[in-house]
Structure formats: C-alpha cells, structure tokens
Amino acid sequence: MAQRDKKDQEPTELRAPEITLCANSCGFPGNPATQNLCQNCFLAATASTSSPSSLSSPVLDKQPPRPAAPLVEPQAPLPPPVEEMASALATAPAPVAKTSAVNRCSRCRKRVGLTGFRCRCGHLFCGEHRYSDRHGCSYDYKSAARDAIARDNPVVRAAKIVRF
C-alpha cells in the first residue's frame, strides 16, 4: 500500500525538451551533440575543417607507385595471314541455326514453358510427370545417395594400439 501512495504523490506530467536554435542563426533547431548546430551547418563546418587535410593527402598520393619488379610483356602470337583465314572459312561447315530451348514434357509432350521441372536424368517434365516414378526415370538415386554418403563421411579408423 505504501508503494501506491508514493506513486500518487509523484507528478506524471511529461515535459517537452527545450528546443535550442542553431548557433549560426539559420533558424533551424540545433543539436547539443553537434555544438548546437543544425544538420546543414554541422555538415558544412565539418566539410570545411576536413578539406585542408584532404587537400594535402592527394598531393602525396600523386607520386607514381614504384613497381617491385620490372614488367615483361609477353609477346602475343601473330595472327595468321589473310589467305589462311580465307581458306579456313571456306572449309568450315556452315553454322547451324540454334535450336530453341526444349520447353515440352519429355513424357507427354505437353508445353511446360517456365513451369517445367528438370529431372536428374536430364529431361524436362510437366507437373504430372515430374516425379521419378511417374516418368520411368533412368537415374539411380540409391547409388548416387550411397556414393554421396561415402564421399561426405569417410571411414575413420584409429591406429592399432601396440602393447609392449
């Protein structure tokens, strides 16, 4: 009960923090953390104080870097003469037009577009034939899983204990 009386005696009103205007008299509110400057004036002040030091650093950076070892440029092979290129083009077969991407189910030949499912056997299937038991998949999942487990979990054998 004593706690309740103590709460009743304390004032519960909220006080707004005092607003101080910018020290440069620009009319915006200042922040005590930035020496009572507004954000714009503080950024301008920090930019002006950091600019002399930034001017001296590029002068030092303008010196060319010294290479550790002399660079030796590898000689590129000379291109073959024009006559050889012409004969090579004449003997090369004509380029075959690219075939469009397969976008039909390998089982029912239904158009699947972007909704097709590519199986591990390498074929594309529709939603009905996407499972291996539905399309008679030739991929051996059991041996692939067995090999993956054997590869990822090598057998660890301790050295034989020699007793004297």
UniProtKB/Swiss-Prot annotation:
Induction profile: By cold, dehydration, salt, submergence, mechanical wounding, heavy metals, and abscisic acid.
Record Gene3D superfamilies: 1.20.5.4770, AN1-like Zinc finger (4.10.1110.10)
Annotated residues for binding of Zn(2+) 3: 119, 121, 135, 137
Cited function: May be involved in environmental stress response.
PROSITE patterns linked: ZF_A20 (PS51036), ZF_AN1 (PS51039)
UniProt zinc finger (AN1-type) residues: 99-145
Sequence ranges of Low complexity compositional bias: 48-58
Record flagged with keyword Zinc-finger: yes
Binding residues for Zn(2+) 2: 105, 108, 126, 129
Binding locations of Zn(2+) 1: 22, 26, 38, 41
Membrane-crossing residue ranges in chain numbering: none
Zinc finger (A20-type): 16-50
GO molecular function annotation: DNA binding; ubiquitin-protein transferase activity; zinc ion binding
GO biological process, one term: protein ubiquitination
Keywords: Metal-binding, Stress response, Zinc, Zinc-finger
Annotated region described as Disordered, given as residue ranges: 48-81
Stated name of the protein: Zinc finger A20 and AN1 domain-containing stress-associated protein 1
